Design a protein with these regions (language model features):
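Internal alpha-helical transmembrane segments
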Residues: 12-24, 30-51, 60, 178-244, ...
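Small-residue-rich helix-interface/hinge motifs
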Residues: 6, 10-86, 116, 120-190, ...
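Pore domain of cation channels
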Residues: 209-220, 382-396, 402
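Functional transmembrane alpha-helices
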Residues: 2-5, 174-207, 231, 235-246, ...
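Terminal peptide-recognition signature
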Residues: 25-28, 66, 251, 259-262, ...
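Short, flexible surface segments
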Residues: 60, 71, 258-261, 285
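Short amphipathic alpha-helical interface segments
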Residues: 84-112
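Conserved PDZ fold ligand-binding element
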Residues: 103, 109-110, 120, 251-274
Length: 453
């Protein structure tokens, strides 16, 4: 029973920490997309699932909610997939001519195959340009695209609810209404594309990709600053008073206890912890080291034998100090730099395996999260801050589908002056996913050997 509770505790704290941090990461992408005028159809805590609790924002049209698969979160930013369909403009125009129409009817009218029409509808659905149409009693079929589509509410300028403040709700059509395009089919499709990720320039695309990473780093930074300023940090006190004695240690066997003040070691007077440390180091290797100490105002003495490779088992006294904001910020920033250096070492072949052996998958993070939670809120939040840093910088690795991999593709396209062929991007993504999977399996194996077996 104890083992089961331990596992459940690890799973709970691990999922809680990762879900919140990934949700915040996706929140960065969401906010950046909205700031760039890009449509976002969904923003959820948890992975996509047919079962969810949600609320659709009347102001921006985005569906906010939570799913049972609490393994992170996601923001459905329109136009993230590098897909293009040559006849999407015709399909879009036809849907707005009819208001509501089936894929089969569109295929007949446009003299296209149903597969071609469905491909175009999937693209337009992902752009937030159309909506699925379900008649009374019908429900979405998991794993399948809808076969009937309808128009979205549009104002005179062509804006939809996904366009936020620019949408004139008072003078807009209703969902499923026929609406006349204000321009040609190709131009209207180009307008719709301008509200997607693909329709933005390099700077805005890079900003949207980096926003999640920035939020993770900022989250970790603020967490550490808060902990250092409010809860404080434990620092050593340079005094001869013992902070802790290891149970079963040489010092414990000699009768030395927590709170005893070491007066001398092997005849060397001690008034600070550095005096104690130096005296023990010099006396190591002797069989009759005399230690004089004070407890409750009374002096005591004892003798210990300490080999050169043995430890006495005493620790320095500590105290909790609340740091000022500047010192807290400086110390927090040092952790940011350390994490960044660690991730950079992962890219250096001579250090790759060393870093991977020290890294953890979700299993290791869950176990350590449970241990941190048991140690107290400050320890748990400190660990969460370090994981947030790691999550942010790991996403910078140039491996698709990570943000860093996508950014590399954007840089290549900027230098080349054109978009990479869809086939090339697809191949690169598959290779990246395979590499990412191998890294995960390796770290999972290490965690199982480290924490379970």
């Amino acid at each position: 029973m104890e083992t089961v509770l331990s596992v459940l505790s690890s799973v709970f704290w691990g999922l809680l920490m990762l879900s919140v941090l990934v949700f915040l990461h996706e929140g960065g992408h969401f906010l950046a997309a909205r700031a760039c005028g890009v449509r976002v159809t969904e923003f959820f805590l948890g992975l996509p699932c047919r079962f969810d609790i949600h609320h659709t924002s009347r102001r921006i049209g985005t569906k906010f909610g939570v799913t049972p698969l609490l393994l992170g979160g996601y923001a459905a930013i329109c136009g993230m997939d590098p897909t293009d369909v040559s006849y999407a403009d015709r399909v879009l125009a036809a849907i707005y001519r009819h208001g509501r129409v089936t894929v089969a009817d569109l295929a007949v009218e446009l003299e296209l195959s149903e597969e071609d029409v469905l491909e175009a509808c999937a693209l337009l659905l992902g752009w937030g340009s159309i909506a699925p149409w379900y008649e009374e009693g019908e429900k979405p079929s998991p794993g399948y695209y809808p076969t009937k589509y309808q128009t979205l509410p549009r104002d005179a300028a062509g804006y939809t609810t996904f366009d936020g403040r620019r949408f004139d709700r008072e003078h807009a059509t209703a969902e499923g209404d026929v609406w006349e395009l204000p321009c040609g089919e190709a131009e209207f499709l180009a307008r719709e594309r301008s509200h997607t990720y693909l329709g933005q320039g390099f700077v805005k695309r890079a900003f949207m990709l980096l926003a999640g990473i920035i939020v993770n780093i900022l989250t970790g930074f603020l967490l550490l600053m808060s902990i250092y300023s409010i809860a404080g940090v434990t620092v050593p006190v340079d005094t001869n008073v013992i902070g802790q004695v290891d149970e079963g240690s040489i010092a414990s066997a000699a009768g030395i206890e927590d709170g005893d003040a070491i007066l001398s070691v092997d005849g060397v007077s001690c008034s600070t912890w550095m005096d104690v440390y130096d005296a023990i180091g010099k006396a190591a290797g002797k069989d009759d080291i005399a230690i004089e100490y004070e407890r409750d105002g009374k002096k005591h003495s004892t003798t210990v034998a300490l080999k050169e490779d043995e430890r006495l088992g005493v620790y320095v006294s500590t105290q909790v100090v609340r740091l000022d904001p500047i010192t807290s910020a400086r110390l927090s920033f040092s952790y940011v730099v350390q994490t960044a250096k660690g991730v950079m070492r992962l890219l250096q072949p001579q250090h790759t395996m060393e870093i991977l052996d020290k890294s953890s998958s979700i299993v290791g993070i869950s176990v350590m999260s449970s241990q941190a939670a048991a140690a107290g809120p400050a320890t748990f939040l400190s660990f969460a801050a370090l994981i947030s840093f790691s999550l942010g910088f790991m996403n910078l690795l140039p491996i698709p589908p990570l943000d860093g991999g996508k950014l590399v593709i954007e840089i290549i396209q900027k230098i080349a002056g054109r978009e990479l062929p869809l086939k090339v991007q697809t191949i690169v993504s598959y290779v990246g996913i395979a590499l990412f999977a191998l890294l995960f399996i390796y770290m999972l194996r290490s965690d199982i050997l480290r924490f379970i077996l």
